[in-house]
């Protein structure tokens, strides 16, 4: 898939904004999200620091990421936005299946602790936004991205 922002930056599943406590939350569509992810990856490589990507999806009964209906995805993105800094960016890592958030500022002294707190905050937020039948199936994966690709 060509993810060049010059060719089709915001096509189907494009960027959209959600109102969140009188603030607008910008959510990138898959092509734009990957474009900005590539920029962040290059920036982090130059600075010799890892780029942290959180991927969130809803597992079906077989453990496979399920397609998220619009009502669920909107609440998912609102929950993510309430859990991260406004300098982090969120969007579709994989359209309608996997949400992504890039943590652009990680505490340098204790990066693992900073990431753990963010994930815990996100889980608690999801528990308030969704019934247990949904929140228990939301999977949050932490990935460190380096020049060679995604590392689990």
Where on the chain are the PLM-derived regions?
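Active-site-proximal structural segments of metal-dependent nucleotidyl cyclase/transferase enzymes
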Residues: 36-58, 63-64
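A short glycine-enriched loop-to-beta-strand structural element that forms part of the catalytic core
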Residues: 91-107, 128-152
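Regulatory sensory/coupling modules that transmit signals to nucleotide-handling catalytic cores
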Residues: 1-9, 117-124, 137, 146-148
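Conserved helix-loop-beta segment at the catalytic/binding core of cyclic-nucleotide signaling proteins
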Residues: 41-46, 76-108
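Active-site loop/short helix in cyclic nucleotide turnover domains
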Residues: 19-22, 55-70, 84
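Alpha-helical scaffold within the catalytic cores of cyclic-nucleotide enzymes
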Residues: 76-84, 115-130
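Short helix/loop segment flanking the catalytic signature motif in cyclic-nucleotide metabolism enzymes
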Residues: 63-72, 101-119
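Amphipathic HAMP/coiled-coil signal-transducing linker helices
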Residues: 9-30
């Amino acid at each position: 898939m060509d993810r060049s922002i010059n060719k089709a930056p915001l096509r189907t599943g494009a960027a959209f904004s959600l109102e969140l406590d009188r603030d607008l939350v910008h959510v990138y569509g898959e092509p734009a999200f990957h474009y900005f992810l590539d920029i962040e990856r290059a920036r982090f490589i130059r600075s010799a620091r890892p780029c942290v990507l959180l991927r969130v999806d809803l597992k079906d009964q077989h453990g496979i990421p399920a397609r998220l209906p619009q009502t669920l995805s909107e609440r998912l993105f609102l929950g993510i936005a309430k859990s991260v800094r406004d300098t982090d960016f969120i969007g579709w890592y994989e359209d309608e299946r996997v949400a992504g958030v890039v943590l652009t500022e990680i505490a340098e002294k204790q990066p693992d602790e900073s990431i753990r707190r963010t994930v815990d905050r996100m889980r608690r937020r999801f528990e308030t936004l969704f019934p247990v039948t949904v929140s228990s199936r939301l999977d949050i994966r932490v990935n460190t991205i380096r020049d060679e690709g995604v590392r689990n």
